[in-house]
């Protein structure tokens, strides 16, 4: 039997990821009217633009849901966000400005926790609002089936009957009004927004055009730092980690990770920290563009990597970055819980994050403009006395360095011979216009 149902399974229970917006409201009502038995599941992800979560299940019941549940996903989402920071699981960057994979993290948590709740209710068919051109349709597909092997997928937006009747937002609004709910469309924005406690994604519509800049976006987690009329005074903030876990901000210790992330968002948001404009490759290899906010994630990430560079050696840091980029891709593709991702994640958390204990002080200014003011840790391998230029006791002498340099003669000789070989085969030019060594000429002189 096929996993994806193209038409409404009449008479059967269908779980719908219900946001309370026009799309899912119309879909739920339509499914009930057509004879299905819809169950509504709403994820509380700590969305900064959601005012009343309790109202959402009540509306679902009004629209015909057999049952409606609100699932608090915030604790798990923050835990996954901190894990991503510990592993550096971020692969999309532009000129050093990072996208913190906040939407993929949200999908990993939503896709597993909502389907687990559905399974408890005996609901084995799942629908959500993802479209066939995006990443989420595959992410939810993977996470849903990982959680419930018996799961079937029904998406109204892939059902031609639904599309023919309610193919646009205007038709959906009229459908709701005719049913007596008087649903009014919200004011149309120049882009769409998806958010959770870790960050916000702004994309589509006007933002599909690269000549539309960040300036058309109204941030929901921070300030318009690019607007000269917005006052953004500099601010010092101290972040403390213990064994890779953020525990304190500005001297205040948090026992609740949700509250810590909210406070990190408030601090970073006051400066517009963590906002980025990215061109990325979707799972299907087509490029898309998004503008992202993640003030708390950015704040914690900066402090974490500052401690990382002061504590671990070069090879470990290099492996952290390489594994982090690969893990970020797995996360983006909906493979956060696949074995290849768990392997990378476990190694970074076990051998890298466990040593990250200390405190970093930053001065935040506008946007991603900041300075590192101080770094303190008992685990630092940074020892200024080892390389001081001042006179005094040293851990090694000039004679030690002469010996070390002499040992380099071995690989320098090997490299010179390779360069001669490259010149002989024409791979290296002896032209004066190149920046390469004139090895051909050097070889001639050596032979003479």
From Swiss-Prot:
The family database entries (Gene3D superfamilies) matched by this protein are listed as: 1.10.287.400, Argininosuccinate synthetase, chain A, domain 2, HUPs
The processes (GO biological process) annotated in the record are: argininosuccinate metabolic process; L-arginine biosynthetic process; urea cycle
What is its subcellular localisation? Cytoplasm
InterPro entries assigned to the protein according to its UniProt record, in alphabetical order: Arg_succ_synth_type2_subfam, Arginosuc_syn_C, Arginosuc_syn_N, Arginosuc_synth, Arginosuc_synth_CS, Arginosuc_synth_type_1_subfam, AS_cat/multimer_dom_body, AS_multimer_C_tail
Q: Which UniProt keywords apply?
A: Amino-acid biosynthesis, Arginine biosynthesis, ATP-binding, Cytoplasm, Ligase, Nucleotide-binding
What EC designation does it have?
6.3.4.5
| Substrates-to-products reaction catalysed | L-citrulline + L-aspartate + ATP = 2-(N(omega)-L-arginino)succinate + AMP + diphosphate + H(+)
Binding of L-citrulline occurs at 99, 135, 139, 192, 201, 203, 280
Residues the entry annotates as binding ATP: 17-25, 43, 129, 131, 136, 194
The record's GO CC annotations read:
cytoplasm
Any Pfam family: Arginosuc_synth
Q: Name one GO molecular function term.
A: argininosuccinate synthase activity
Q: Where does L-aspartate bind?
A: 131, 135-136
PANTHER family associated with the record: ARGININOSUCCINATE SYNTHASE (PTHR11587:SF2)
Q: How does it assemble?
A: Homotetramer.
Similarity section: Belongs to the argininosuccinate synthase family. Type 2 subfamily.
Q: Provide the protein name.
A: Argininosuccinate synthase
Q: Which organism is it from?
A: Pectobacterium atrosepticum (strain SCRI 1043 / ATCC BAA-672)
Which gene underlies this protein? Answer: argG
